[in-house]
Amino acid sequence: MLVLSRKEGDQILIGDDIIIKVISIEKDCVKLGIDAPKNIKVLRYELLQEVKNENVEALQGKERLIRIKDLKGLFKDG
């Protein structure tokens, strides 16, 4: 991992066409501007993780529902 120190207004170039600019630095918050081509996804990592976790929870809920229906069928037959 490359670690850089940047001041407000400084920019970083990634590849030939992605620019990261330090917009402002406040107490515990750094605001970044990202200029990238439209075909490049730019996502906040924590939001991506949250969506993944919600998808896992939804899948587990569906699996539980299927097991409950299977159990219900066992009692119905017996």
UniProtKB/Swiss-Prot annotation:
| One term under GO cellular component | cytosol
Question: Which cysteines are disulphide-bonded?
Answer: none
Compartments annotated for it: namely: Cytoplasm
SUPFAM superfamilies per the record?
CsrA-like
Q: Which InterPro entries match?
A: CsrA (IPR003751), CsrA_sf (IPR036107)
Task: Tell me the GO molecular function terms.
Answer: mRNA 5'-UTR binding
Which Gene3D superfamilies does this entry report, sorted A to Z?
Answer: Translational regulator CsrA (2.60.40.4380)
Residue spans crossing the bilayer: none
PANTHER family registered for this protein in UniProt: CARBON STORAGE REGULATOR
UniProt function note: A translational regulator that binds mRNA to regulate translation initiation and/or mRNA stability. Usually binds in the 5'-UTR at or near the Shine-Dalgarno sequence preventing ribosome-binding, thus repressing translation. Its main target seems to be the major flagellin gene, while its function is anatagonized by FliW.
Q: How does it assemble?
A: Homodimer; the beta-strands of each monomer intercalate to form a hydrophobic core, while the alpha-helices form wings that extend away from the core.
The protein's name is Translational regulator CsrA
Which gene produces this protein? csrA
